[in-house]
């Protein structure tokens, strides 16, 4: 015979999987065309020269070269460009 009252149920125990967002290639790093530079939600970084923007706002290299981060415009937007070699 059990001498322990039944435990109540919990409403915890769920958490979403991490999405591995962030900068994948940093300033000055050499990249090949097609390399992912940044995975992001929304446009924290904008695509500059030789950089493409995917459906999920992923920035990727369109040409081989070096990654360059720059702040431009009246709103101080962050742009990522590739300086072709």
Swiss-Prot record:
Matching SUPFAM superfamilies: Ribosomal L27 protein-like
GO cellular component: a single term: cytosolic large ribosomal subunit
Spans annotated as Disordered: 1-20
GO biological-process terms attached to the record: translation
A Pfam family: Ribosomal_L27
Molecular function GO terms recorded: structural constituent of ribosome
Entry-linked Gene3D superfamilies: 2.40.50.100
InterPro entries: Ribosomal_bL27, Ribosomal_bL27_CS
UniProt keyword terms in alphabetical order: Ribonucleoprotein, Ribosomal protein
Protein family per UniProt: Belongs to the bacterial ribosomal protein bL27 family.
Protein name: Large ribosomal subunit protein bL27
């Amino acid at each position: 015979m059990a001498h322990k009252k039944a435990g109540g149920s919990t409403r915890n125990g769920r958490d979403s999987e991490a999405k591995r967002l962030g900068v994948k290639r940093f300033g000055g790093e050499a990249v090949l065309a097609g390399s992912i530079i940044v995975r992001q939600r929304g446009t924290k970084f904008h695509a500059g020269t030789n950089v493409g923007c995917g459906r999920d706002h992923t920035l990727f290299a369109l040409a081989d070269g070096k990654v360059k981060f720059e702040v431009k415009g009246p709103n101080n937007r962050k742009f990522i460009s590739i300086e072709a070699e």
